[in-house]
């Protein structure tokens, strides 16, 4: 019950959506530093060499606020994907497939409109967003805060993309090792932001 999406602004619990299991909902409210720290902790737990060298410089409210982080070359442990790796996975892994150019990970825009923070039935099958957050189907208006079912949802309740990955569109944002940058028109090997 400490997952932030499980609580309203006054710390009372939301009712979970359609029997969602709290333990199967995504973690949220973690810093980028928390995410790389977790990668190292999981690596150590599984006997793998941690992928990051981390020197924590500031912690606030149990979260790492600042740290010096570097990638350990050739480490066998878990790490965050690069932005390019995340995009490759979200697009379905095959640049020659139609899904590579879909508007959403796993679905194209079904109602012929581009998504611009508006209702779009093309997104309903693959992602949770402000218009389908409670029922899973697009409603006539955005979902407001402090409503039963508002917040994150159990992972895997929507359709997976071509690689079998869920929630690459909607639910929560994912951390990447680097940042987004505009793609060059040419080929780039192992791009980073």
Language model features: what each stretch is:
Residues 1-123, 180-185:
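Active-site microenvironments of metalloenzymes and redox enzymes
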Residues 25, 189-193:
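Short, intrinsically disordered, charge-balanced linker/junction segments flanking boundaries
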Residues 26-29, 79-81, 87-88, 127, ...:
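Structural recognition of the beta-strand scaffold that forms the well-ordered cores
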Residues 31-34, 84-85, 130-133, 159-162, ...:
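Short, flexible loop/turn elements at secondary-structure junctions
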Residues 67-73, 120-169, 188:
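Short, well-ordered junction/capping motifs at the entry into regular secondary structure
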Residues 95, 132-135, 169-172, 179-181:
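Short loop/turn segments at secondary-structure transitions that flank enzyme active sites
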Residues 98-100, 174-175, 193:
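Short, low-complexity, polar/charged sequence segments that are solvent-exposed and flexible
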Residues 110, 116, 131, 168, ...:
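Short, electropositive, low-hydrophobicity segments enriched in small/polar residues
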């Amino acid at each position: 019950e400490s997952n932030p999406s499980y609580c309203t602004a006054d710390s009372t619990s939301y009712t979970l959506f359609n029997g969602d299991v709290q333990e199967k909902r995504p973690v949220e409210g973690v810093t980028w530093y928390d995410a790389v720290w977790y990668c190292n902790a999981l690596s150590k737990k599984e006997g793998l060499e941690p992928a990051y060298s981390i020197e924590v410089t500031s912690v606030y409210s149990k979260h790492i606020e600042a740290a010096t982080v570097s990638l350990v070359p050739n480490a066998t442990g878990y790490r965050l994907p690069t932005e390019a790796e995340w995009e490759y996975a979200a697009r379905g892994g095959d640049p020659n497939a139609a899904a590579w150019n879909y508007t959403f990970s796993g679905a194209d825009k079904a109602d012929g409109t581009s998504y611009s923070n508006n209702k779009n039935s093309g997104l309903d099958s693959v992602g949770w967003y402000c218009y389908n957050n409670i029922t899973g189907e697009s409603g006539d208006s955005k979902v407001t805060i402090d409503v039963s079912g508002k917040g994150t949802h159990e992972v895997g309740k929507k359709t997976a993309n071509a690689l079998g990955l869920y929630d690459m569109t909607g639910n929560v944002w994912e951390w990447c090792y680097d940042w987004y940058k505009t793609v060059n028109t040419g080929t780039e090997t192992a791009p980073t932001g």
